[in-house]
């Protein structure tokens, strides 16, 4: 039972008390006479039956427990026991602590007593069963005589109290989630709310406890945050500064998640989340929800969280147990600090990276972190043309791409760059226009987007003076890196200062952003700054990448079935990344292109030679991702086993080519191969110098203590090792002292049990000899194990030396990484050379396939030309079981500049034009092509308008997408571009679509004069070809029609329609001159298993419409013939002008007759 309190205690009322008419006052606590005047007045109003039963005066009733019991049963209302000291305590306090419904019999309702009762004996407590039954009885007579139940002095105070209790009741149990909240408290083992027992609470404690604490660092008295552990408070301090980060906190031998982070981790990692509060201001729960993972699985789980799109922070303990015990803060929690932050674009801490091919259908993104900023172009609307600056960084390789350009309202330019770069994370500086913002959300927001995975988007504000601030920030960043007359540093700063303003803004934002991750030093490598729009490469926009399936197929967005999949025979990861760049950026520099093709040719000719086999063997032996390992060394994030593997791999490569002293020693003639091989032996000296410092066995086992050879250890490492040796020697000497105390003649022997070292075993029969100062650690039935005070002291000293040694070893390893990072440039050049050799060998392997030939590049002065003999689709021939039917075609200026391609549905028109475009692309990346022969001039861009799709995110219909892409082509195409237009105009009515197709074909043939492949089902466009002076050539995809012929059935009857429906088409997939006047759509409908009745109706309607068109053409031809005859007869004696006027109608007549 709790002792009496020194102050009046404010207690939580029972839930049942809220339903009584009034709570009785304490009759005898406020006056020496046993009750207040108000109470005596109330007693005088008792009914007559009560007075008869009592049979005595009021004073006697108060002192008789039996009479009191009878009184309570008849009064039918609560009655409080007398309590002379007013402390509000009774003998039933223990029972109240176990029940929420039970209540203290002496609960204080009115104001505290002014004077304690003296000389009155406390009344014994009635039996609890009758008390619970009778104390809440309802007395209607009492209400009739005194509706308030209180005197005037107590009325206001009691009303306030009851209103406060009612408010608490409604707050706790008056909402739909109240029962669920109680169940969760039961689940947490909190069957009783703190504060219901009323013990030790201060005035106003209840009200504060029920209120939700504000998320501030100051803790209210009685608030739940006051019950957090010191470690949880430490977690909150870090979380407040990183609210957007999932924190993984090191706690002993585990890493733990707390609060909302635990729920996220449980969902993404499929681990258990222990229930608790998910927010630090959540009421009624005094501990956080949590989840945990083992220390050795940290990298695996962090990688999974990052891949899911989360920003993850790792909070580590910066103190060890031994050093903390020896320090001044031994009673404080471990010091913890946020040491690492990871996102998709900055995660490079493990050898298994995020951009490796995944298990899903979609290929992964390119590993770039892309920053973009936008500003409106002066004089235009806010959503029209905009000026955009972009900078993309690949932290794992050190590559940096930047660009500055103006974009139209369709945002084709920024879309092209996003599709080329495929960023896994975007940093948006400032506000974006509505159109740009929708594009970014569309490309990055879906888990099945064109990037292959959901991309993370982060936004930072942009001030009005951002340009000036960015310039100053970038200048200061690089100014500290310029050292005296260092020419390299000076050129670095000069190159950065020449960047466009919008790119400088992006660079400043990226420096600030990557500083948080410790990766800002990547911008020191300005050698790898590349402009996206340098005219050394062919322009391939985003639409073309998708239409030609360059990186991903159009079916499931996976890499299989793409051009990259068909060409990728690389052996190393740096080689694969370089090949991807080559495919996306074909060359325009003829000299570089010839150099690359010549290298592929030489490797192909000597593919069975020892030299080529050795190159392949060296590349096959490279298992590590050297490019990423080097950048991890540069960042200081490399592990010891990885460092050993990287250095040994580089040494093995240098030894393999150690005999190469001059370019002639390489054994190749191609300058590209010679330069690549000649760069490899030079790294041998650098790598060997660092390997000589390392103990290979220790590095392989990740043993930091013996990682360095003895003569390469630092002074700190040596001192701490000597200190450990000295302590261990003292422990050995101490064995004799221990034996002396145990009355033994021979020194005791230390044993290790369950990881506890230096235990002294003593048989239980000899325990009488053990000094009292020895600490028993463990034991069995026969013996006990002890630590002496000296052993404990020496072990603590040894542990301190060990932990200091570990820190010294880590510092020495960090210094070694910094030293290797100073040699990053030559090592990176060597890895780049290996990647080049890998790509060339891959292209040579492709060239060795049957039917591949070397393309011939025509002189620059030659008019635009593409000539292909027996060409094949480079992707389809690998996927089709029966192979691909070759085609022969040519485009040339002045004629034929364009081809008008017709043919039946599914006849191979789209496959043919894609094959031509892909062969041009292959030729200009330096690859052999699947054709008997191919000659071409360099093409500066490939534009495509293929397929039918809408653009909901931009509010564009299918036809709007068609004409918008066509407009962009007409604006950007030059005389040296290749344009592919597939069924332009099909998104609108026949007349409008044919008119647009007519106009566009005429424009590209007469105005732009670019090489064009134009697919259409509008056969009347053949007239345009005839009227363009041979610039357009009509071709069609050959086919054979079999089955009942139309002339076998009577015209217009059902048999004729059935003949159309039954007619079968055999596709020959060959290109031939001429126009196909029918598309045979019913044949495709039949292959798609359209119901027979529907096909019959469609055939009949098709025949009716076709005959109607023929009839109109025939009538028109007759009228035209009459006009020609009439004009010829009337104008026989006229001048030459009449003859000229008659030429056009005559030609029109001939064309009409041909179409009949």
Curated annotation (Swiss-Prot):
Keyword Glycoprotein: no
Annotated Gly residues bias: 1126-1137
Keywords: ATP-binding, DNA damage, DNA repair, DNA-binding, Nucleotide-binding, Nucleus
Biased composition (Low complexity): 82-91
Binding positions for ATP per the UniProt entry: 903-910
A biological-process GO annotation: mismatch repair
A GO term for molecular function: mismatched DNA binding
Stretch list, region Mispair-binding domain: 225-345
GO cellular component, one term: nucleus
Comp. bias intervals (Acidic residues): 198-212
Family classification: Belongs to the DNA mismatch repair MutS family. MSH3 subfamily.
NCBIfam families the UniProt entry points to: PRK05399.1
Function noted in UniProt: Component of the post-replicative DNA mismatch repair system (MMR). Heterodimerizes with MSH2 to form MutS beta, which binds to DNA mismatches thereby initiating DNA repair. MSH3 provides substrate-binding and substrate specificity to the complex. When bound, the MutS beta heterodimer bends the DNA helix and shields approximately 20 base pairs. Acts mainly to repair insertion-deletion loops (IDLs) from 2 to 13 nucleotides in size, but can also repair base-base and single insertion-deletion mismatches that occur during replication.
Protein name: DNA mismatch repair protein MSH3
Organism: Chaetomium globosum (strain ATCC 6205 / CBS 148.51 / DSM 1962 / NBRC 6347 / NRRL 1970) (Soil fungus)
Organism classification: Eukaryota, Fungi, Dikarya, Ascomycota, Pezizomycotina
């Amino acid at each position: 039972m709790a002792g009496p309190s020194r102050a009046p205690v404010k207690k939580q009322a029972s839930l049942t008390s809220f339903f009584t008419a009034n709570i009785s006052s304490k009759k005898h606590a406020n006056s020496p006479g046993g009750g207040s005047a108000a109470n005596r007045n109330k007693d005088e109003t008792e009914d007559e039956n009560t007075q008869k039963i009592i049979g005595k005066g009021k004073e006697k009733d108060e002192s008789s427990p039996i009479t009191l019991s009878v009184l309570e049963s008849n009064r039918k209302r609560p009655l409080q026991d007398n309590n002379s000291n007013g402390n509000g305590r009774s003998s039933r306090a223990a029972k109240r602590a176990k029940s929420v419904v039970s209540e203290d019999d002496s609960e204080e309702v009115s104001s505290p007593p002014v004077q304690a009762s003296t000389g009155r004996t406390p009344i014994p407590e009635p039996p609890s069963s009758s008390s619970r039954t009778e104390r809440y009885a309802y007395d209607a007579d009492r209400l009739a005589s005194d509706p308030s139940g209180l005197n005037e002095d107590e009325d206001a105070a009691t009303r306030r109290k009851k209103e406060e209790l009612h408010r608490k009741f409604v707050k706790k149990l008056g909402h739909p989630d109240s029962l669920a909240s109680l169940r969760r408290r039961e689940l947490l083992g909190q069957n009783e709310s703190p504060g219901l027992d009323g013990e030790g609470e201060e005035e106003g404690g209840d009200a504060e406890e029920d209120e939700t604490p504000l998320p501030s660092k100051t803790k209210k008295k009685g608030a739940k945050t006051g019950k957090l552990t010191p470690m949880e408070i430490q977690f909150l301090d870090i979380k407040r500064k990183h609210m957007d980060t999932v924190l993984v906190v090191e706690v002993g031998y585990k890493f733990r998640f707390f609060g909302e982070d635990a729920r996220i981790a449980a969902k993404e990692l499929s681990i258990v989340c222990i229930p608790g509060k998910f927010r630090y201001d959540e009421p009624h729960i005094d501990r956080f929800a949590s989840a945990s993972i083992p220390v050795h699985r940290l990298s695996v789980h962090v990688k999974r969280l990052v891949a899911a799109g989360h920003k993850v922070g790792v909070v580590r303990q910066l103190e060890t147990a031994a050093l903390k015990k020896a320090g001044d803060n031994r009673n404080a929690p471990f010091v913890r600090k946020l040491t690492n932050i990871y996102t998709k674009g900055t995660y490079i801490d493990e050898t298994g990276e995020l951009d490796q091919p995944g298990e899903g259908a979609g290929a992964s993104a390119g590993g770039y972190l892309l920053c973009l900023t936008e500003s409106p172009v002066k004089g235009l609307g806010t959503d029209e043309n905009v000026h955009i600056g972009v900078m993309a960084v690949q932290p794992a390789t050190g590559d940096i791409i930047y660009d500055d350009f103006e974009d139209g309202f369709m945002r084709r330019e920024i879309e092209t760059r996003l599709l080329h770069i495929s960023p896994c994370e975007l940093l948006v500086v400032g506000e974006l226009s509505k159109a740009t913002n929708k594009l970014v959300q569309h490309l990055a927001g879906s888990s099945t987007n064109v990037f292959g995975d959901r991309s993370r988007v982060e936004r930072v504000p942009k001030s009005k003076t951002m340009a000036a601030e960015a310039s100053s920030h970038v200048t200061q960043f690089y100014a500290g890196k310029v050292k005296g007359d260092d020419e390299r540093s000076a050129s670095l700063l000069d190159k950065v200062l020449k960047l466009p303003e919008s790119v400088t803004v992006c660079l400043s934002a990226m420096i600030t952003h990557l500083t948080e991750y410790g990766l800002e030093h990547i911008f020191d490598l300005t050698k790898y700054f590349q402009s996206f729009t340098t005219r050394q490469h062919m322009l391939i926009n985003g639409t073309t990448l998708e239409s030609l399936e360059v990186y991903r197929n159009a079916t499931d967005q996976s890499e299989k079935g793409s051009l990259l999949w068909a060409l990728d025979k690389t052996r190393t990861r740096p080689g694969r990344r370089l090949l991807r760049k080559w495919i996306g950026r074909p060359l325009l520099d003829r000299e570089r292109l010839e150099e690359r093709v010549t290298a592929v040719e030489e490797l192909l000719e000597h593919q069975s030679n020892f030299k080529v086999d050795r190159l392949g063997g060296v590349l096959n032996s490279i298992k590590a991702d050297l490019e990423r390992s080097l950048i991890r060394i540069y960042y200081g994030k490399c592990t010891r086993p990885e460092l050993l593997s990287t250095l040994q791999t580089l040494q093995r490569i240098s030894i393999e080519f150690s005999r190469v002293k001059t370019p002639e020693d390489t054994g190749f003639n191609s300058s590209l191969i010679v330069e690549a091989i000649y760069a490899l032996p030079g790294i041998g000296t650098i790598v060997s110098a660092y390997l000589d410092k390392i103990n290979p066995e220790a590095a392989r086992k990740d043993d930091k203590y013996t990682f360095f050879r003895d003569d390469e250890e630092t002074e700190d490492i040596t001192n701490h090792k000597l200190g450990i040796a000295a302590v261990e020697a003292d422990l050995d000497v101490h064995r004799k002292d221990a034996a002396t105390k145990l009355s033994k003649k021979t020194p005791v022997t230390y044993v290790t049990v369950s990881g506890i070292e230096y235990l002294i075993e003593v048989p239980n029969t000899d325990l009488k000899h053990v000094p009292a100062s020895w600490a028993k650690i463990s034991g069995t039935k026969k013996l006990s194990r002890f630590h002496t005070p000296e052993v404990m002291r020496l072990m603590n000293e040894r542990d301190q030396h060990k932990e200091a040694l570990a820190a010294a070893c880590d510092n020495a390893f960090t210094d070694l990484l910094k030293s290797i990072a100073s040699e990053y440039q030559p090592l990176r050049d060597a890895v780049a050379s290996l990647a080049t050799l890998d790509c060339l060998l891959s292209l040579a392997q492709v060239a060795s396939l049957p039917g591949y030939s070397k393309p011939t590049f025509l002189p620059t002065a030659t008019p635009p030309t593409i000539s292909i003999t027996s060409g094949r689709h480079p992707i389809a021939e690998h996927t089709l079981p029966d192979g691909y039917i070759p085609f022969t075609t040519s485009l040339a200026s002045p004629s034929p500049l364009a081809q008008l391609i017709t043919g039946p549905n599914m006849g191979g028109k789209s496959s043919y034009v894609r094959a031509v475009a892909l062969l041009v692309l292959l030729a200009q990346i330096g690859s052999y092509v699947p054709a008997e022969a191919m000659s071409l001039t360099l093409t500066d861009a490939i534009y495509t308008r293929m397929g039918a799709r809408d653009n909901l995110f931009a509010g564009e219909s299918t036809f709007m997408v068609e004409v918008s892409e066509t407009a962009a082509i007409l604006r950007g195409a030059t005389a040296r571009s290749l344009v592919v237009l597939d069924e332009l105009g099909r998104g609108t009515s026949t007349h409008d679509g044919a008119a647009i197709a007519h106009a566009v074909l005429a424009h590209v043939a007469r105005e732009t004069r670019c090489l064009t492949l134009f697919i259409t089902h509008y056969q009347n466009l053949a007239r345009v070809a005839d009227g363009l002076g041979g610039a357009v050539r009509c071709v069609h995809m050959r086919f054979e029609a079999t089955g009942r012929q139309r002339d076998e059935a009577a015209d217009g009857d059902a048999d004729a329609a059935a003949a159309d429906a039954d007619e079968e088409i055999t596709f020959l997939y060959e290109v031939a001159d001429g126009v196909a006047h029918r598309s045979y759509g019913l044949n495709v409908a039949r292959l798609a298993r359209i119901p027979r009745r529907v096909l019959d109706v469609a055939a009949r309607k098709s025949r009716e419409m076709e005959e109607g068109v023929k009839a109109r053409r025939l009538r028109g031809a007759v009228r035209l013939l009459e006009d020609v005859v009439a004009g010829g007869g009337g104008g026989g004696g006229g001048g030459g002008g009449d003859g000229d006027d008659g030429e056009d109608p005559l030609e029109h007549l001939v064309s009409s007759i041909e179409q009949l």
